[in-house]
UniProtKB/Swiss-Prot annotation:
It catalyses: L-arginyl-[protein] + ATP = N(omega)-phospho-L-arginyl-[protein] + ADP + H(+). A motif (RDXXRA motif of the pArg binding pocket involved in allosteric regulation) lies at residues 337-342. This is Protein-arginine kinase. It comes from Halalkalibacterium halodurans (strain ATCC BAA-125 / DSM 18197 / FERM 7344 / JCM 9153 / C-125). Keywords: Allosteric enzyme, ATP-binding, Kinase, Nucleotide-binding, Transferase.
Length: 356
């Protein structure tokens, strides 16, 4: 398969679109946790009960559509390990669903902007992904899907507590709003060390791109709400929006200061990173991610011409182990992955040169 075709098939269609403030906010996500009234929660359910839940959801949801969105139901038990790994790398399912769920499944829309996980920590996890800074738009879509589902199945709901969930932090609205942000200038100027504790004090959580416990590789940070009880969905999203808008302003100001005070050093860093990506024969995931961050910053600041801004979004995913093995068509050792990663990045940058 040609690299162009592999990329076009591998990258989710929603990721190829532009969104507001996409130089800093790569994506916005709304996730709703829901459970069904007549079934035991996944943590307590037997294997047979988990099977019955999937059949129940399939009967009521998978064979119908929400507006123009048709869904495909994929069962974890039917998938090879690497296919599940790829879905995790695309942020379409959680590691928990891929590795630990009893008869887990996922319903995916055609453009992969909507995924509904089944038998994860909760019976249903409704997720909507948008490019750029579009939290409000993602909330509107997620709420619409939630209403559509609620018209077909009975949710576990308490008048005082709201939606009942497996984890106490999700009780209430069951809503988790998050954004993925690229904050290289705040990291370079070390302002991030002062900002992150302040964000945590506001009741928000900062993680790396693969969720809880993951490192913020490539200067990419996932910022989300923590508690869902006692606030409306709109208030939760508005609180997060306010913090994200401040971070956007601070990152832009830090980028401007770096350009004014250290332009030559910044150019050198960007071009060195581009040179390593364009010519290296072996590259580890961590180094590749950092160099891609430098290159993306150079593109956004106009220091590097003729390279697509989407290259960070694309290669952050395509150079993960699951995708590398999918492209190779075989299981790879760590050393083989480092070699393949370097080759794929070189080939992707060559495509940029050929298109200019």
């Amino acid at each position: 398969m040609s690299l162009q075709r592999f990329i076009s098939e591998a990258i989710s269609p929603w990721m190829k679109k532009d969104g507001p403030d996409s130089d800093i906010v790569l994506s916005s996500r709304i996730r709703l946790a829901r459970n069904l009234q007549s079934f035991r929660f996944p943590l307590l359910a037997t294997i047979e009960e988990s099977k019955q839940l999937v059949e129940h959801v399939k009967h009521h949801l998978a064979e119908s559509s929400y507006h123009t969105n048709r869904f495909e139901l994929l069962c974890m038990d039917d998938m090879k390990p690497n296919v599940k790994r790829v879905l995790v790398e695309k942020h379409l399912i959680s590691p928990h669903l891929a590795e630990e769920s009893k008869h887990g499944a996922v319903m995916l829309s055609e453009d992969e902007s909507i995924s509904i996980m089944i038998n994860e920590e909760d019976h249903l996890r409704i997720q909507c992904l948008f490019p750029g800074f579009q939290l409000s738009e993602a909330l509107v879509l997620a709420s619409g899907i939630d209403d559509w589902i609620e018209g077909k199945v009975d949710y576990a709901f308490d008048e005082k507590r709201g939606y009942l969930t497996s984890c106490p932090t999700n009780v209430g609205t069951g809503l988790r709003a998050s954004v993925m942000m690229h904050l290289p200038a705040l990291v370079m100027t070390q302002q991030i060390n002062r900002i992150l504790p302040a964000i945590n004090q506001l009741g928000l959580v900062v993680r790396g791109i693969y969720g809880e416990g993951s490192e913020a590789l490539g200067n990419l940070f996932q910022i989300s709400n923590q508690m869902t009880l006692g606030k409306s969905e709109e208030d939760i999203v508005e609180d997060l929006r306010g913090v994200v808008m401040q971070l956007i302003q601070q990152e832009r100001a830090a980028r401007k200061r770096l350009l004014e005070s250290s332009r030559l050093q910044l150019e050198d860093r960007v071009y060195r990173s581009y040179g390593i990506l364009a010519h290296s024969r072996i590259i580890e995931s961590k180094e590749a991610t950092q160099k891609l961050s430098d290159v993306r910053l150079g593109i956004d600041l106009g220091l590097l011409k003729g390279v697509s801004g989407n290259i960070l979004n694309e290669l952050m995913i395509l150079t993960q182990p699951g995708f590398l093995q999918q492209y190779a068509g075989t299981v790879l050792t760590a050393d083989q992955r480092d070699e393949r990663r370097a080759a794929l990045i070189r080939a992707r940058l060559k495509l940029e040169d050929e298109s200019n």
